[in-house]
Amino acid sequence: MSAREPAGRRRRASTRPRASPVADEPAGDGVGFMGYLRAVFRGDDDSELEALEEMAGDEPPVRRRREGPRARRRRASEAPPTSHRRASRQRPGPDAARSQSVRGRLDDDDEVPRGPPQARQGGYLGPVDARAILGRVGGSRVAPSPLFLEELQYEEDDYPEDVGPEDGGGARSPPKVEVLEGRVPGPELRAAFPLDRLAPQVAVWDESVRSALALGHPAGFYPCPDSAFGLSRVGVMHFASPDNPAVFFRQTLQQGEALAWYITGDGILDLTDRRTKTSPAQAMSFLADAVVRLAINGWVCGTRLHAEARGSDLDDRAAELRRQFASLTALRPVGAAAVPLLSAGGLVSPQSGPDAAVFRSSLGSLLYWPGVRALLDRDCRVAARYAGRMTYLATGALLARFNPDAVRCVLTREAAFLGRVLDVLAVMAEQTVHWLSVVVGARLHPHVHHPAFADVAREELFRALPLGSPAVVGAEHEALGDTAARRLLANSGLNAVLGAAVYALHTALATVTLKYARACGDAHRRRDDAAATRRILAAGLVLQRLLGFADTVVACVTLAAFDGGFTAPEVGTYTPLRYACVLRATQPLYARTTPAKFWADVRAAAEHVDLRPASSAPRAPVSGTADPAFLLKDLEPFPPAPVSGGSVLGPGVRVVDIMSQFRKLLMGDEGAAALRAHVSGRRATGLGGPPRP
């Protein structure tokens, strides 16, 4: 205390945010944050990297909602001391954080590092022994959704012998995995991926009917349809929040669900089942090829992340950033000698052709095709259906609350929860990419004995942990398990729906990975190659939908933070880079949708169904509400307790404080141009104009 200060007066706690280990730095040629990205993302196709290199010299100011001096003083006085904030969500200051950013790149842009760094030794969990993890878990951390278990209980058994040609989804073309043609002999490829044995397990019409049912869902929270439906009212779409933010206006929710279906399931079904008459078997061939390409990319990206620092351009700060992120990432590839088919080259591009472009489109909606789901066995079919249903419902709920023409209607509690959801989705997607890379390597190299291959076939590991990973449960608990998260869930209808969607993806991925381990067999059970292949493809379907849902969340985060001026959205320090790595690896499976394109698609869908956004509330008699309280009951077992107390997400950082990183990594050129035009007062291309009267 200063000698001039009167006795008894305490100095006000500083609200200046703390520093973060990673932050923005103006980029140059191989310098700073972009230098690190070059080391990870370099490859034959540099189009995405070139988009990342676009940087404005000066950051545009964030357009914030106006507030008077009294409101500013009140907000400053209510800010908690930094020491009382949750350690994993601390906010870094731009200046302090910038001093810790790094520069550097690897010497050879074409060579994949093939040294034996320690990160590539060990099993599925890297240097951590899976048996040691099982000893620490003590019990199962896999808690499937009660709604999923109820749906699974009423699902009838498979009846492949009774499915006729007219019920099996149409003609079947010869299956193939294009990326492996000429590299793997036909008999070996058919043994690894017996696509010719993937006959429909149920009739397509039966699966179509079941997708339209949703046990336990009350009126207003509709299940996935199989075609566009006319339950929503046309005309004005009201975005004002109800007096009780724990509920939705039923009319607006129905309109949001209609928009969600037009940009996801209806889009993919229109392009495949109706226009081109593509068969589900063709979709499965694409999926198998995409998963193999994804496995190659996952191996390459993981190898570069763990590459030893070498070359004069890599300084101590660059090596430190690489070490920090490498210690957190789930991408821990096995040695090149164990997987020669994955490590033979660099990153691979997506499959060419119009069919592949369609399968990768529509926000990852291939699992909304009943004919594709009918090719899966019972548990995986229900898991894919349930994940599709809940992410569809969450997309509809987001579109009922977020719109470029009604940003001021978004509540702070809704914006704050979005970053937590994105954190979990990024970790879950990263772990799934790693799992697919390992299991594909195991399928293609059946005579190689590697600890990672043994781990992914270890049933007890996947029975104890979702995706067999302590990082997944750690991220879930860190983002969604603290007191603040539970309060956000209980006090917002949108947050409850988003939490249920994350839980559904957790349940689906935990189910298919456990079923894969069972299909691998052991000394007491026969190995089932066809069942194992079905489970790999089911994981690919769920991952594709997860990525589409994550892009939807990113679009809403950018809208709230950059267009609405909200400071509430926070993400883990490494979430943008983690998700960007995932998007790079999954290009063969999923064509990402930038925020600008997402909102352009939403606007086109709204015009198609004649919806006009307004910042008002509906009047009687259409002002009824829908309460998602049933989802809060479903969420009671989630998230499970973590295995350890360490942080998976890293320190929390406000999205507005890492604007250039977020923009370069996740928004793309079009989104950056839209933001630049918007903050300068011009209409933001891709973000929509003023609402129509």
UniProtKB/Swiss-Prot annotation:
Q: Which keywords does the record carry?
A: Host cytoplasm, Host nucleus, Late protein, RNA-binding, Transcription, Transcription regulation, Virion, Virion tegument
Residues forming the motif Nuclear export signal are 647-670
Question: What is the role of this chain?
Answer: Tegument protein that can bind to various RNA transcripts. Plays a role in the attenuation of selective viral and cellular mRNA degradation by modulating the activity of host shutoff RNase UL41/VHS. Also plays a role in the primary envelopment of virions in the perinuclear space, probably by interacting with two nuclear egress proteins UL31 and UL34.
Q: What is its main location?
A: virion
User: Where in the cell does this protein reside?
Assistant: Virion tegument; Host nucleus; Host cytoplasm
Q: Which InterPro entries match?
A: Herpes_UL47 (IPR005029)
Tell me what else is known: Expressed in late in the infection.
Task: Enumerate the residue ranges of region (RNA-binding).
Answer: 50-75
In which family does this protein belong, per the annotation?
Belongs to the alphaherpesvirinae HHV-1 UL47 family.
How does this polypeptide assemble, per the annotation?
Interacts with US3 kinase. Interacts with UL31 and UL34; these interactions seem important for efficient virion nuclear egress. Interacts with UL41/VHS.
Compositional bias (Acidic residues) spans?
A: 48-57
Q: Per the Swiss-Prot or TrEMBL record, what residue ranges does the short sequence motif Nuclear localization signal cover?
A: 63-75
Report residue spans for region: Disordered: 1-32, 48-126
Where composition is biased (Basic residues), the residues are 63-75
**What name is this protein filed under?**
Tegument protein UL47
Recorded domain comment = The nuclear export signal is CRM1-dependent.
What is the protein's species of origin? Human herpesvirus 1 (strain F) (HHV-1)
A biological process (GO) annotation for this entry?
A: regulation of DNA-templated transcription
One example of the protein's molecular function in GO is: RNA binding
Q: How is it modified after translation?
A: Phosphorylated by US3. This phosphorylation is required for proper nuclear localization.
- A GO cellular component entry from the record: host cell cytoplasm
